[in-house]
From Swiss-Prot:
Gene3D superfamilies: 3.30.465.10, UDP-N-acetylenolpyruvoylglucosamine reductase, C-terminal domain, Uridine Diphospho-n-acetylenolpyruvylglucosamine Reductase, domain 2. The keyword Cytoplasm applies. Pathway: Cell wall biogenesis; peptidoglycan biosynthesis. HAMAP family: MurB. It comes from Methylorubrum extorquens (strain PA1). It catalyses: UDP-N-acetyl-alpha-D-muramate + NADP(+) = UDP-N-acetyl-3-O-(1-carboxyvinyl)-alpha-D-glucosamine + NADPH + H(+). It is found in: Cytoplasm. The active site is at 179, 228 (proton donor), 298. One of its GO terms (cellular component) is cytosol. Its EC number is 1.3.1.98. This is UDP-N-acetylenolpyruvoylglucosamine reductase. Its cofactor is FAD.
């Protein structure tokens, strides 16, 4: 099915959709690596009800992929078949605070969530200042930094499943472990409830500044990068294993292992998604051969490879 015919089928099944449907939309500008092919169809829902109606009407055979802020993501050069969904800040970007309770849309950047909590003198969420992603991604992978994890402060999650039905998940039902949640893959998170602790605003903001300074000193945040590439294996640190295997500065095409922090891959300019993913696989091989450790990707890789020329 072509992108045009897919959109026609969607509009016929859900004529009252208010969100935006785009065909063959480039995703490179939506990812921090600035690489990747197009989405066959990109849908940006107007709100949660619009998302629900869309999913309820969509043919179950059509694959659905969710795109967040694009910080922890490689979109392969052949793009994404079916539908990619991106939740916008207008409908899914609010933060509301009531006492110690924080309700956030999943398009809210993690750094903004940390700031909102600090402004309300709520402690426990400052670690989000060091995570370059959105709340939705943090929920999906139990994101963490600087001694804190999403699981530490989460109360409840709201989402829409593939049938268009609203689902709620308690903290226990999320099944968090290191960089993982057990929530069903077909659920698109739309909102979350967190709980902070009463604290001193100045102290919380000072902690956030410390997190920011540590990140700027140790990570190539001004480069085109996707953040931490590999999960830390049990009994080791990914960056140390990569360094010991002689991979610091390693180059493949336009991609490079960062000299500053070797658990970061960067696009030096002109890289393809295949360059970046291929470099990551080469790093995994060298680490395995050198130390016996098996590194697992933390960055999500989606889509299909480009067809041979």
């Amino acid at each position: 099915m072509t992108a045009h015919s897919l959109i026609d089928a969607i509009r016929a099944a859900a004529p009252d959709l208010r969100g935006r449907l785009l065909e063959n939309q480039s995703l490179a500008d939506l990812t921090w690596f600035r690489v990747g092919g197009p989405a066959q169809v990109l849908f940006s829902p107007a709100d949660e009800a619009d998302l629900s109606a869309f999913l309820a009407a969509l043919d179950p055979a059509v694959p659905v992929t969710v795109i967040g802020l694009g910080s922890n993501l490689i979109v392969r050069d052949g793009g994404i078949p079916g539908v990619a969904i991106r939740l916008g800040g207008k409908a899914f970007g609010s933060v509301e605070i009531d006492g110690e309770t924080i309700r956030s849309g999943t398009a809210v950047p993690d750094m903004r969530l940390a700031k909102a909590a600090a402004e309300a003198s709520l402690d426990g969420l400052a670690f989000f200042r060091g995570i370059p992603g959105s709340v939705g991604g943090a929920l999906r992978m139990n994101a963490g930094a600087h001694g804190g994890e999403t699981t530490d402060v989460l109360v409840e999650v709201r989402g829409i499943d593939r049938k268009g039905e609203v689902r709620r998940f308690t903290h226990a039902e999320m099944g968090f472990r290191y960089r993982h949640s057990s929530a069903p893959d077909d659920v698109i998170f739309t909102g979350a409830t967190f709980r902070g602790r009463p604290g001193n605003r100045e102290a919380i903001e000072a902690e956030m500044e410390r997190v920011t300074a540590a990140r700027e000193a140790a990570q190539p945040i001004r480069e085109r990068t996707g953040g931490s590439t590999f999960k830390n294996p049990e009994g080791g640190k990914a960056w140390q294993l990569i360094d010991a295997a002689g991979c610091r500065g390693l180059i493949r095409g336009g991609a490079q292992v960062s000299e500053m922090h070797c658990n970061f891959l960067i696009n030096r300019g002109g890289a393809t998604a295949a360059d970046i993913e291929g470099l990551g696989e080469e790093v995994r091989r060298r680490v395995r051969d050198h130390s016996g450790f098996e590194l697992h990707w933390e960055i999500k890789r989606i889509g299909v490879e480009a067809s041979p020329a």
